[in-house]
């Protein structure tokens, strides 16, 4: 067990160092068994955090993200958080004014993260396979850049299914009523 933990820590350190040394705009920490975003990474990336445009934290064990994460990486264009245990986003997600795409699929959201509706550049939202029942259709319809929202395999209420289509100017992907996600 300790050996596996040590390997995971070494893998994270290696990936962070690669990002810093190469001057990359991408930080890929997918499948690193993270339960939280490592605090030490903020210090290591302090001189390059503004040039990070894509972060992948997919398929970890994250239960939450801190406000510091959102404000430190305020220049993000893409954020991949799929396959975690997230159920909410911090209000500081509003700092991500340049964010174009966010993937929150396969998490534990029961409520639609309404803070996303305030992001002016956001084009794509993926919330597939969560537990969302209601969606702020009017707020989504007012988003200037939104092109696509994926809500497949969420137990959406009938009202959303009826009200949304005539109000929206973007693609809204929904499963047939009562459909459940396929087993992995």
Curated annotation (Swiss-Prot):
InterPro entries membership: Leu-rich_rpt (IPR001611), Leu-rich_rpt_typical-subtyp (IPR003591), LRR_dom_sf (IPR032675), LRR_domain-containing (IPR050216)
Descriptive protein name: Leucine-rich repeat-containing protein 20
Signal peptide from the UniProt entry: none
Keyword Phosphoprotein tagged: yes
Residue spans of the LRR repeats: 51-72, 75-96, 98-120, 121-141, 145-167
PANTHER family per the UniProt record, alphabetical: PTHR48051, RAS SUPPRESSOR PROTEIN 1
Top-level lineage group: Eukaryota
Record's keyword terms, sorted: Leucine-rich repeat, Phosphoprotein, Repeat
Protein's gene: LRRC20
Pfam families (UniProt xref): LRR_8
Organism: Homo sapiens (Human)
Residues bearing the modification Phosphoserine: 175
């Amino acid at each position: 067990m300790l050996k596996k933990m040590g390997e995971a820590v070494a893998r994270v350190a290696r990936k962070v160092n690669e990002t810093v040394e190469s001057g990359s705009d991408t930080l890929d920490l997918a499948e690193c068994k993270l339960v939280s975003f490592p605090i030490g990474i903020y210090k290591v990336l302090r001189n390059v955090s503004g040039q990070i445009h894509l972060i992948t934290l997919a398929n970890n064990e994250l239960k939450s993200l801190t406000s510091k994460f959102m404000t430190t990486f305020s220049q993000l264009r893409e954020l991949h958080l799929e396959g975690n245990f997230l159920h909410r986003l911090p209000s500081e997600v509003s700092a991500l004014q340049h964010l174009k795409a966010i993937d929150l699929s396969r998490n534990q959201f029961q409520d639609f993260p309404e803070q996303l509706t305030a992001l002016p550049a956001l084009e794509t939202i993926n919330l597939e396979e969560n537990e969302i029942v209601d969606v702020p259709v009017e707020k989504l319809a007012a988003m200037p850049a939104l092109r696509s929202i994926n809500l497949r395999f969420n137990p959406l209420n009938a009202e959303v299914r009826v009200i949304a289509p005539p109000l929206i100017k973007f693609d809204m992907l929904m499963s047939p009523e009562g459909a459940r996600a396929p087993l992995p």
